[in-house]
Amino acid sequence: MTNLNYLETSGWLKSLKEGKSIDYNSNPLPWYSYPAIEFIEDKLKSDFRVFEYGSGQSTLWYAQRVKEVISVEHNPDYFCQIKSYAPENVILSLLEDKEKYAAEINRYNDGYFDIIVIYGINRGRCAELCYRKLTANGLIIFDNSDRE
């Protein structure tokens, strides 16, 4: 029963039931593995800036932990859903054109972001454009890298 207890206390069962990634207390979680979440959480600092290609529960999770989250979303329905929950330190943009979506990061100076998450569309182009925008010790997260 230890494994079942972990599934409950981690929020995994609740996430399955709700259809979104949340912890036991219904707080948002990135849809990453639990070890990945723990690894990233240990590295986060309150003055970090995060850029996300694709918004979601991770947007809300990062927003609770860092200074600024900038997310670009291509899906209008998902954009509206996340926008309704986003706190003040989240800048969320809707860009349906895949080239404009990938290039949104170019609005920011090189070395501006501590973490860049690539989850949404046009991943190859996003990867080409984003690496210069990282700080010297920055981290790029390729989420669901098997997606096209």
Functional labels for PLM-detected ranges:
Residues 3-47:
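Class I SAM-dependent methyltransferase Rossmann-like catalytic core
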Residues 31-99:
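SAM cofactor-binding core of SAM-dependent methyltransferases
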Residues 46-48, 67, 111-113, 136-137:
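Short coil/turn segments at beta-strand junctions that form active-site/ligand-binding loops
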Residues 49-52, 71, 114-118, 140-142:
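Short catalytic-loop micro-motif centered on adjacent basic/acidic residues
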Residues 98-106, 139, 145:
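Glycosyltransferase catalytic domains, chiefly GT-A lineage
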Residues 101-103, 120-123:
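Active-site glycine-rich loop that binds ribose-phosphate moieties when present
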Residues 105-115:
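A short acidic, Gly/Pro-enriched loop at the edge of an enzyme's catalytic core
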Residues 115, 121-148:
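C-terminal substrate-binding/active-site "lid" region of AdoMet-derived donor-dependent transferases
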